[in-house]
A protein has these predicted regions:
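Acidic, divalent-metal-coordinating active-site segment for phosphoryl/phosphodiester hydrolysis
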Residues: 201-214
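Acidic two-metal-ion nuclease catalytic site recognized across multiple nuclease folds
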Residues: 2-50, 212-283
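Short Asp/Glu-rich motifs
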Residues: 126, 208-209, 264
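Conserved non-catalytic scaffold segment of RNase H-like nuclease domains
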Residues: 11-162, 178, 182-200, 248
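Conserved beta-strand -> loop -> alpha-helix junction used to position metal-binding or nucleic-acid-contacting
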Residues: 160-173
Length: 283
């Protein structure tokens, strides 16, 4: 589930899951992980990347709907997925299914009544087919992947061992689309001329994202850039220039207290246009 940034306290809470646990898969698009080196002026200097292997050929675009924020207290009640072929820009298969729950505290957000999830339906068979789609993919792509990923390995959902990529935080959409940093699925779809007819159901958001990818001229380059290893950086700007950090997609107080921070590759950090430094979060 991805909710629009900046549209209320509850929506902001849904996006505050840290993506630091997402490890970019070096074997797909990066032969040797880049290492960020902090220069004396606070800027980062990237090492020279080695030869890059081909980008992933098969993506599983994935989204979830849940009863709350915490996988230890709440449940995933809907999974949507689209198997997407990158070279052909084509949807190969798609699935959506509900998982039964007793109550849904987020019904006002996703519109899924708990009673509907308990209606007779072949969700175990659907879950089994979903696992075949996972097996057929090279990479899992999700909008706000840090949120979606945490539900797998809880309840009936198996853990997913494939690499993950976040279309909200890790992909740098072309400047000519006039998107803000970390765009919502809705804004992303509209920027690519995809009609938006519904929101907050799992398969709907997957379809939006698949149609965006169909329209990407350099999807392979976009994916490879997104898979570059990333680390957490803090913006080193005076208070009166804080707008520069915000415009560059840095977040205030999340996850670094009282600081503007964002996950960047070493190449991005060197080109950001203002001083940044590597940040280590305490356990």
């Amino acid at each position: 589930m991805e909710l629009e940034p900046g549209s209320g306290e509850e929506r902001n809470r849904w996006q505050q899951t840290s993506l630091l646990s997402l490890v970019a898969p070096a074997q797909l698009c990066d032969g040797t992980a880049e290492k960020a080196v902090e220069a004396t002026d606070g800027a980062a200097t990237p090492s020279t990347p080695s030869h890059q292997p081909p980008p992933p050929a098969r993506l599983l675009i994935l989204d979830t709907e849940t009863t709350g924020l915490d996988p230890l207290k709440h449940r995933c009640i809907e999974v949507g997925a689209v198997l997407f072929d990158v070279p052909q820009r084509a949807v190969l298969s798609q699935i959506s299914f509900l998982l039964p729950c007793q109550t849904n505290e987020a019904e006002t957000v996703n519109g899924i009544a708990a009673a509907v999830t308990r209606l007779s339906q072949p969700w175990p068979e659907a879950l089994a087919y979903f696992q075949t789609l996972v097996a057929a993919s090279d990479l899992i792509l999700a909008h706000n992947a840090g949120f979606d990923r945490q539900w797998f390995g809880h309840g009936p959902l198996p853990a997913i061992e494939k690499p993950w990529l976040c279309s909200m935080e890790d992909l740098r959409w072309p400047p000519d689309r006039n998107l803000r940093a970390n765009p919502s699925v809705r804004d992303l779809a509209l920027a690519y001329g995809v009609p938006v007819w519904a929101a907050h159901r799992a398969l709907t958001d997957c379809i939006y994202l698949a149609q965006v990818l169909e329209r990407c001229d350099d999807l392979e380059g976009l994916l490879c850039a997104g898979l570059e290893p990333r680390q957490l950086y803090r913006a080193r700007l005076p208070y009166e220039e804080r707008h520069r950090a915000r415009q560059a997609g840095f977040r205030w107080n999340d996850p670094v207290p009282k600081a503007w921070s964002r996950r960047l590759s070493a190449r991005e950090a060197a080109a950001i246009g203002f001083p940044v430094s590597l940040e280590q979060l305490s356990a």
